[in-house]
Design a protein with these regions (language model features):
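C-terminal transmembrane helix and the adjacent membrane-cytosol boundary/short C-terminal tail
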Residues: 2, 6-10, 18, 28-32, ...
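Non-cytoplasmic
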Residues: 24-26, 34, 158-161, 199-234
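Interhelical loop and adjacent transmembrane-helix boundary motif
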Residues: 2, 35, 47-55, 215, ...
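Cytoplasmic-entry segments and transmembrane alpha-helices of multi-pass inner-membrane transporters
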Residues: 81-118, 174-175, 188, 197-198
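Transmembrane alpha-helix signature in integral membrane proteins
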Residues: 54-87
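Short membrane-interfacial helix/loop motifs at transmembrane-helix boundaries
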Residues: 20-54, 119, 223, 271
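Transmembrane alpha-helices
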Residues: 13-20, 98, 102, 152, ...
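Membrane-interfacial helix termini and adjacent extracytoplasmic/periplasmic loops
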Residues: 36, 45, 112-151, 185, ...
């Protein structure tokens, strides 16, 4: 036991330095008056009150709207793909899952730039439409371009946990359902879907949290017109230089994420 304790000590030191200390600093900045040094702590809730202004609440609403839309699309497309993959032979499943994860090996920034080339007014898609005699369509800097970028970047995080649940499912339950006279639809809704819910909830949690907290995709595909909560935090730290307000927003986002994760965990237990 002592040997294992010694092995874990370097990790604890690393976690304290790169996780605990930054969180403490963010908390101190969040509750400190703007312009004051952290070491001369002056308690205030003004940074949190500021976030309740209509301008910033609209950012939360926009972030949740696009996050929910992205999650729904990823679930609608990802579940059938995961189901189809789970029905393939085991070797084919490994290959298909590899193909699903390969895009994640490429830096998100590069993938987003690739979508900019595809969706721009002079991009590949509009060029193909022109060859078909169709007028160019404005796709960049719209909800469409942002959602497309979010869906394509985060789809694997929906497919993989669902596939894991489906592939580990005890097939005897499905056979028992058929033996009891259930048709394919009843078997899916009463057996397959319910047994795959843990994977679905994990996928929903990952895609939603990534969607509302990212800032690269909305910034590039939205042309700076789409201020989501991730972009707001980035702008406060990098552009505005208001670390106090940026830290307060970061804490609010962390609390929202914890609440969402708790709800997902409760739903998983209920199922």
């Amino acid at each position: 036991m002592k040997q294992y304790r010694n092995l874990i000590k370097p990790y604890l030191v690393w976690a304290f330095v790169v996780i605990v200390i930054p969180l403490i600093l963010i908390a101190l900045y969040a509750f400190t008056e703007d312009g004051n040094e952290v070491l001369t702590f002056s308690f205030t809730l003004d940074n949190f009150r500021k976030f309740l202004e209509a301008t910033y609440m609209s950012v939360i609403f926009k972030s949740f709207k696009l996050g929910i839309l992205t999650t729904v699309i990823c679930l609608g497309l990802g579940y059938p793909l995961a189901y189809i993959i789970s029905k393939c032979p085991e070797k084919s499943q490994s290959l298909l899952i590899l193909l699903v994860t390969i895009p994640e090996w490429i830096n998100m920034l590069l993938r987003t730039y690739a979508w900019m080339n595809l969706l721009s007014d002079n991009g590949i898609i509009n060029h193909l439409l022109g060859l078909l005699g169709i007028s160019p369509v404005t796709m960049m800097y719209t909800d469409f371009s942002v959602v497309v970028g979010l869906v394509c970047n985060f789809m694997p995080f929906m497919i993989i946990p669902i596939h894991t649940s489906l592939s580990k499912m005890d097939k005897s339950f499905i056979e028992a359902a058929y033996d009891l006279g259930a048709n394919k639809f009843q078997t899916f809704t009463k057996v397959i879907w319910k047994l795959s819910i843990p994977g679905v909830l994990n996928g929903i949690m990952m895609v939603f949290l990534l969607s509302i907290s990212t800032f690269v995709i909305p910034k590039l595909l939205g042309g700076g017109q789409y201020m989501l909560i991730g972009n707001l935090i980035e702008s406060q730290f990098i552009s505005v230089g208001d670390w106090n307000f940026g830290s307060a927003i970061s804490l609010i986002l962390a609390v929202l994420i914890l609440i969402f994760m708790s709800l997902m965990k409760k739903m998983d237990k209920d199922e």
